């Protein structure tokens, strides 16, 4: 069980404009602080987890607090072909299999530099590299920069790749539609600051209850500022 109580403070300089706004709206420096508290209880055995919620609900902050050792930061791509940016201790056959496993199957694109790839291709390359380098991966903004068709294909490919290699993958996303495609073993919803389920067959029940809640105007927010 992972308990957290995170207070996020901002270093605000009290300039003339800042002081004027604070005075006009009766706002204090402390009001800019954010607090996130809750508990993530992971199953004994799992391969895929999902931290999901609206923007500003603390997804990345919480993930870095709990899964910082496996957080995937911006990779450095310096070669003219992305295949040469993969780990040096990995064979070409392993790289090719990994590219295919994450849905990066365009061989001509393997020969291109990272900066000319599409957003969807970049995401797949990042995933492939992370999987080649780590056994446990926490991936921020998962599917955030791709259309939903690409997101669906990527989720299905990632599910198969992670389970086949028996690795652990934590996706961080604001998109609830990936629950059905990614099929995570557990979900932490930052809108409610609680575990939603840890059993795969409860996913449909959760999605249905969420739609009903939104249609009824349920307030899902739970952030202290």
Q: PLM features: residue spans?
A:
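ABC ATPase nucleotide-binding domain signature region
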Residues: 6-8, 41-104, 180-181
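Interfacial catalytic loop of ABC nucleotide-binding domains
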Residues: 46, 109-114
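GG-anchored amphipathic helix commonly corresponding to the ABC/SMC/Rad50 NBD signature/C-loop
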Residues: 65-66, 120-139
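Loop/turn-to-beta-strand initiation segments
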Residues: 136, 164-170
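Walker B catalytic motif
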Residues: 138-149
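Conserved hydrophobic alpha-helix in the ABC-type ATPase nucleotide-binding domain
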Residues: 153-158
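H-loop/switch region of ABC-family ATPase nucleotide-binding domains
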Residues: 173-176
């Amino acid at each position: 069980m992972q308990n957290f109580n995170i207070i996020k403070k901002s270093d605000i300089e009290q300039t003339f404009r800042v002081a004027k706004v604070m005075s006009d709206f009766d706002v204090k420096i402390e009001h800019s602080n954010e607090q996130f508290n809750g508990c993530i209880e992971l199953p004994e055995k799992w391969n895929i987890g999902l931290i999901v919620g609206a923007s500003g609900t603390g997804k990345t902050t919480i993930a870095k607090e709990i899964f910082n050792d496996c957080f995937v930061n911006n990779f450095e791509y310096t070669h003219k072909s992305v295949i040469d940016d993969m780990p040096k201790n990995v064979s070409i056959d392993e790289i090719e299999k990994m590219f295919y496993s994450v849905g990066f199957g365009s061989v001509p694109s393997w020969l291109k530099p990272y900066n000319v790839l599409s957003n969807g291709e970049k995401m797949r390359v990042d995933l492939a590299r992370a999987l080649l380098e780590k056994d446990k991966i926490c991936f921020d903004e998962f599917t955030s920069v791709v259309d939903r068709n690409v997101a669906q294909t990527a989720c299905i490919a990632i599910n198969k790749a992670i389970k086949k290699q028996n690795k652990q993958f934590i996706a961080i996303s604001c998109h609830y539609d990936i629950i059905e495609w990614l099929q995570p073993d557990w979900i932490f919803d930052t809108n409610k600051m609680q575990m939603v389920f840890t059993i795969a067959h409860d996913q449909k029940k959760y999605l249905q209850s969420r739609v009903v809640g939104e249609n009824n105007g349920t307030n899902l927010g739970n952030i202290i500022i």
